[in-house]
């Protein structure tokens, strides 16, 4: 990875493009004169000792201010959507708990024991819940106390859409359509019949909250993200396609563990129930043997199954550093010549910030998952739809739109069931859907990157995958010369978050609301970190809602 440049070339920030030697000569300062200033006895280490008591007082004030910011107004109310009370045991997360072998519903006593254990929030109670082969994933993560940013329990998320409302139905219909469109190349969307049918039905739904163009859903915007940049350029962000120089290595972004086309799971009720009971298939799936660039929804789903927590954003940071993308104008080293931003505000800080914020984001969203919302996974709701339409159970509280959906009917024609087809054999992870871990981390990490880099910087030479994903070809769209760092970072976050929707394991609001949660977490972390730097600085960027924000650090002596 190249050393990050302050603007373009390190010496280019000096007056009239002078290099350092010319700059010193212009000031009349010779190398010898510079050396003579360091007379014996003047540069002893003793002269550089700091007042330890003063520094301790500064540190104590900093920690006190940070703690006050993190924990003030800690008594925050966290409402959920009320389904747990209104429709007990039916529409909340229950995967890996014991289920009735006929109805597919959770055993009530098991659910009550699970809720009681969460309220006690200790290891012994959680260990005695009784689950299948797959354990519940880390309920106590959301109880961790942060030492940077704000307390996890001060962040709020709105209640998730309810099963008896149009928005919930629209989100499920979108997932059925995504299952039907998984193997269609993004570059073929405009002319594909199924994609056009999907856009048409989604456009007709009053509860659909995805992007629209001129009030309609079209192939140009269907299944894309909701924020700035998501509708510009190719479907896939450049940060998921272009090669990345990472230290002494070059990362070629072909997938080597991708699910093959046409392979869906959990389309049979017995298989579905087997997975809901917490079981798992012993054998790994057969992956596509040909390395491919991301070209369709199944490829995106494959990426977000194998990715590490902040992999995509660390890669994006490395790409931006290698490309010498311009830093944010508030970076204190933006126009300095004698000192550089090697640690503070430079490559090391940027890379570490992506890691730092990702853990804060994950812990915060796990509090929302387990202790507030406990939203059902889409695959679980698919079981309710199947049982209702086949007449095995009566769930008349489900909003009619999804029960009468063209997408649901097409899935039945293909598979002989109304279950939501899954990309992964085991379906979702064993933790609730809302908020989404991938989406919260995405929102947090791209916010950090937008804070450090100039969002308006143009991404050069955009590319797309060819038809079989084996190579990259130039993107030739009309906007090929106007794709920005800010837009492509937002798109990267959408690709990762909605990639989980392509797999069938998350909802659209899991993406949208979690992105904004992640953004809040990143902002608070940046504000806390701003107090620790001696340099006066600022970060300016655009929030997901389109509003500008500036975070300032006053510095200290």
Put a short name on every predicted segment.
Residues 1-19, 44:
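N-terminal secretory signal peptides
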